[in-house]
């Protein structure tokens, strides 16, 4: 199988080490961080689940059946990996839940545990997700000393804030389908599918821009015309190439950004514009899809700094612990450490 992420540059060079991820679901543990408290009352039943080897949408649909509501009445803050152990909240719009016995649900769904149940006055939405805590275990790791040296660099400098391979689908099929939609001017009322391909299109272009900045030596170095964001994701209007700005970038107070393409003109100028515009021009079909859906231009930081990063190595097994803000991908951290050896998996029909 081809690696779609091989299209993009590595910050620390292509790793020499190899290793396996997710040999077992418990080798990839994700715990959701919402960042707010529930009211304890309201029309929405909040159910905290721990799922193993199941995807979020399947569990949500099963929970809807169990609660006697339609699937559209169950929502979440974020979709979680299937081949993993993940903890997250689901909200169910149901008036009376007194007669529900979640022990029965668990008995018929061995891959799901119900950890906590409460109520809230609003349903969960994707914007509610603050971040995720991760524990990632890589096995059969070669050249462990090189991996440990790279981890020190990651802790100091971070990694490219790429969108991970899951955004692009198996062998890039989501990107290819997005191109077809743009080329054929496909129209649909399926908002979920439209959002899916739009995200793939914008992510693909963003990754290429970041990759070029790495290749040309502008990853941590601002250029004239760059757009900077502060820690609250607000655009900062100042001399981006000044010593003060460079120092703030190095301190993590400001972030260099790249384009999430839209139908409006890029706000970058000068050298920054020459780094970005060619990647939009190189993908006319993706841009046709983006413009046809009136997506507005946005900015995304090009650096990703994992929080509370720790690690340990025992033999050829590496354990990583860290937290990421919403929208960031754990796999792009591992990508800078080792080349992943594909693990053969057999899935049930619940996907």
Curated annotation (Swiss-Prot):
Coiled coil: none annotated. GO terms for biological process: tRNA pseudouridine synthesis. Residues 158-304 form the TRUD domain. It is an enzyme of class 5 (isomerase). It catalyses: uridine(13) in tRNA = pseudouridine(13) in tRNA. The active site is at residue 81. Its EC number is 5.4.99.27. The keyword Isomerase applies. The keyword Protein biosynthesis does not apply. One of its GO terms (cellular component) is cytosol. It holds the Pfam family TruD. GO terms for molecular function: RNA binding; tRNA pseudouridine(13) synthase activity. It comes from the Bacteria. HAMAP family: TruD. NCBIfam families: PRK00984.1-4. Responsible for synthesis of pseudouridine from uracil-13 in transfer RNAs. Belongs to the pseudouridine synthase TruD family. This is tRNA pseudouridine synthase D. It comes from Aliivibrio fischeri (strain MJ11) (Vibrio fischeri). The lineage of its organism: Bacteria, Pseudomonadati, Pseudomonadota, Gammaproteobacteria, Vibrionales.
């Amino acid at each position: 199988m081809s690696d779609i992420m091989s299209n993009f540059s590595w910050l620390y060079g292509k790793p020499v080490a190899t290793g396996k991820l997710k040999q077992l679901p418990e080798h990839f543990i994700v715990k959701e961080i919402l960042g707010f408290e529930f009211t304890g009352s309201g029309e929405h039943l909040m159910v905290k689940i721990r799922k193993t080897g199941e995807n979020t949408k399947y569990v949500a649909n099963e929970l809807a059946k169990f609660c006697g509501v339609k699937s559209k009445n169950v929502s979440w803050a974020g979709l979680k990996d299937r081949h993993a152990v993940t903890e997250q909240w689901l909200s169910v719009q149901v008036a009376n839940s007194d007669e529900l016995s979640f022990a029965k649900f668990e008995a018929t769904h061995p891959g799901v545990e119900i950890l906590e149940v409460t109520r809230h006055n609003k349903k969960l939405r994707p914007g509610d997700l603050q971040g995720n805590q991760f524990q990632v275990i890589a096995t059969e790791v070669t050249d462990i000393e090189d991996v440990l040296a790279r981890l020190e660099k990651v802790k100091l400098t971070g990694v490219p804030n790429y969108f991970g391979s899951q955004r692009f689908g198996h062998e890039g099929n989501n990107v290819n389908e997005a191109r077809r939609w743009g080329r054929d001017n496909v129209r649909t009322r399926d908002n979920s599918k439209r959002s899916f391909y739009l995200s793939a299109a914008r992510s693909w272009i963003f990754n290429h821009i970041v990759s070029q900045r790495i290749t040309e030596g502008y990853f941590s170095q601002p250029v004239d015309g760059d757009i900077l964001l502060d820690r609250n994701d607000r655009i900062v209007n100042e001399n981006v190439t000044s010593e003060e700005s460079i120092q703030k970038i190095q301190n993590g107070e400001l972030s260099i950004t790249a384009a999430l393409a839209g139908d409006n003109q890029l706000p970058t100028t000068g050298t920054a514009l020459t780094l970005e515009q060619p990647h939009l021009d190189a993908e006319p079909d993706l841009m046709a899809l983006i413009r046809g859906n009136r997506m507005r231009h946005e900015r995304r930081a090009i650096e990703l700094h994992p929080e509370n990063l720790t690690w340990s190595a025992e033999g050829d097994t590496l354990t990583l612990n860290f937290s990421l803000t919403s929208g960031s991908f754990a796999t792009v951290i591992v990508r800078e450490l080792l080349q992943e050896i594909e693990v053969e998996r057999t899935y049930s029909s619940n996907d």
